[in-house]
């Protein structure tokens, strides 16, 4: 008997009988050859299915409608003879819920706004030389992640990027850009190469629904956490969203340019929900891909009206297929999972195992937000912070414990953290240094599971937070010396801590959003990187640059083994000072035999006694590049500057 209510459909979809009858692991989507194209769609609840063909990605009449043939396991298919490159299509499906048109869930490109899917020959679409693109080899000691939105990266008129490329994938390909083309102050890719970051994390680049690709972008803006087509690049980031091949080619050009600069690409993926409940997955198989409450209603742990049912077999397959597609086809170097707590542990571990099977796959990063956006109907083990020890040791999490310990809670603008003088927070600073491997609050397998950070796209920028803690009516555009020192101290803590360091683009030049804590659809002007600030705060940029280099020169800070956090020796200092020593690992090429690090969050100088031996001053609260020259050798007592992270190397 056919189900009649959402609750009955939930019972059916979660039954072993349905899984046996419909689990399918053959090809889906487009299988193109010049001689002909196979189309395959998994739609087990459909009663009829047809494909509609178009010459254009938007507008124009349908040039043919052909019935699909029903196969085993809920698959519908058709073979289209002849070269179909450049054709667009959608499906007309009749299910117990009615008749509708649907794009292909496995579409690899699309027309405007992702409504029509596209058939294309990858060999004719790939940029020149794509077959020679390779992922850069980035050892753990050099890993650091810089998070940016494609629009924000180059939207500033002073970015030096060609006007037509601003806010686009192609902005990442332009070489030698400088501030207002002055030939002096680097911007965009030129800036990243000088800064020394090893990975760029791109906020969502797959097709999202909150920006209308058919309209000018002047007043449109959204971060893109509202997916429409999971395997299709976003059209508004391309130079021509009407032609599906352009978004594919230009996305790959961006990735190739970053790889050529030695920078890996981390993709921010948002499989946990879709833009609307009426979406490509729900049209193909109504209700199947989305988690349901006991009464059959859609669970809303994402806070966006729906959440992906990763525990259902074909939904799990879809997620894994999609990630593997981006890894193989686009040479993606890492994946950041939005609201990872909405996925089950089993799915995440299976995905990690599948990535590991790819050539170089064990080096592909995988991490996510270990929380949810609301109450979820997921009743298996969630991939969240509480279950960290159930996840593969190479699946990491954003450590909000570290974030809040350093700068204060993110939900209360006035709540201070360690760098602003919060009493008692030094305990969590010590735990952060050891990537929480020596704390009972978190159960990581190894330090590599911890993302050490203080700012990301969510919540206040670090600069805004520092000013809002200190002042009732902050002047965000002002050059505040205390906030600058606190900013340097915050960076000095997480960039000398174990784990994977991560920061929001522009944190290193005091990025401000004028106190706006959730700018996901604010103006492009508020969100874009202000490249003038990179020049104005060049000394802060240089401080980050020096710490990145210092960290790479002492590989044990990026160690992935649990023995390394255990080797940290913490000093018994007067609160709130924190001090520690870490010996280098034999044979790792470290520039110094040990590091000795002190954090002083007070606004007065402090005197400490160094461990025995001779110590070279590598970094203090003003300069983090002393290690590059012949800085002074210290023994015995030394003075820590106010609001400073001070680093010594044993010689």
Where are these regions (language model features)?
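The feature marks proteins involved in alpha-glucan
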Residues: 1-34, 38, 70-174
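Glycan-recognition and catalytic regions of carbohydrate-active enzymes
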Residues: 21-26, 493-516, 526-595
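Carbohydrate-binding surface patches
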Residues: 31-47, 567-611
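Beta-strand-rich binding/interaction modules
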Residues: 41, 47-58, 62, 605-622
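C-terminal beta-strand-rich structural cap/linker in extracellular carbohydrate-active enzymes
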Residues: 43, 85-89, 630-651
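Solvent-exposed beta-strand/loop surfaces of large extracellular or lumenal domains
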Residues: 53-75, 618-634
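Conserved alpha/beta catalytic core and glycan-binding cleft of carbohydrate-active enzymes
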Residues: 120, 352-353, 357-509, 516-520, ...
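Substrate-binding/active-site clefts of carbohydrate-active enzymes
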Residues: 151-330, 336-359, 365, 377
